[in-house]
């Protein structure tokens, strides 16, 4: 999948939403990725992130509302490796990751607010496939998200 979010915005100005007001950092081996939105809402518990990334993710991006917490990581190298094996295009986390040197070597996009070496606590909590909001955008399961070094955008239909 080849695209530039700037061009997607220019060509679809009436239908895209741009995530704003957050300083995202890219840690994965892919600079650009996109696909159908799948959502998880959790706070400092990556049980649902691990669960979802263990399923078939071909053509999909997991978007996680982690409440913006940077106190512990919601994804690290082992979960990301499993996501690659299951065909996920990428992961966008309103929260933190860890194992950043290993993430950079994986063929997957990983965008988060930052990194921290502390792992998540697993309490088997979190919600799947619900509307979540951060960065001024509502992420709806079944819609589409595209991310590159220019930013993150959403659209109600596939643009690529």
UniProtKB/Swiss-Prot annotation:
Catalysis performed (reactions): 4-hydroxy-4-methyl-2-oxoglutarate = 2 pyruvate; oxaloacetate + H(+) = pyruvate + CO2
Catalytic EC class: lyase
Residues the record lists as binding a divalent metal cation: 99
Cofactor note: Divalent metal cation.
GO biological process: regulation of RNA metabolic process
Binding site for substrate: 76-79, 98
Cofactor dependence: a divalent metal cation
Keywords annotated in UniProt: Lyase, Metal-binding
MF-aspect GO terms: 4-hydroxy-4-methyl-2-oxoglutarate aldolase activity; metal ion binding; oxaloacetate decarboxylase activity; ribonuclease inhibitor activity
EC number assigned by the record: 4.1.3.17, 4.1.1.112
Similarity comment: Belongs to the class II aldolase/RraA-like family.
NCBIfam families assigned: NOT-MenG (TIGR01935), PRK09372.1 (NF006875), PRK12487.1 (NF009134)
Purpose: Catalyzes the aldol cleavage of 4-hydroxy-4-methyl-2-oxoglutarate (HMG) into 2 molecules of pyruvate. Also contains a secondary oxaloacetate (OAA) decarboxylase activity due to the common pyruvate enolate transition state formed following C-C bond cleavage in the retro-aldol and decarboxylation reactions.
Subunit structure comment from the entry: Homotrimer.
Protein name in the entry: Putative 4-hydroxy-4-methyl-2-oxoglutarate aldolase
Native source organism of the sequence: Alcanivorax borkumensis (strain ATCC 700651 / DSM 11573 / NCIMB 13689 / SK2)
């Amino acid at each position: 999948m080849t695209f530039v979010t700037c061009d997607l915005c220019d060509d679809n100005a009436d239908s895209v939403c741009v995530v704003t007001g957050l300083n995202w950092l890219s840690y994965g081996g892919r600079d650009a990725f996109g696909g159908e939105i799948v959502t998880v809402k959790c706070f400092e518990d990556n049980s649902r992130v691990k669960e979802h990334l263990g399923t078939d993710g071909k053509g999909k991006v997991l978007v996680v509302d982690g409440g913006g917490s940077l106190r512990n990581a919601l994804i690290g190298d082992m979960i990301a490796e499993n996501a690659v094996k299951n065909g996920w295009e990428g992961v966008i986390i309103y929260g933190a990751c860890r194992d950043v040197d290993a993430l950079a070597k994986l063929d997957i996009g990983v965008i988060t607010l930052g990194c921290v070496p502390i792992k998540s606590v697993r309490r088997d909590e979190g919600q799947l496939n619900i509307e979540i909001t951060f960065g001024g955008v509502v992420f709806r399961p079944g819609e589409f998200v595209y991310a590159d070094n220019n930013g993150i955008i959403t659209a109600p239909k596939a643009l690529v």
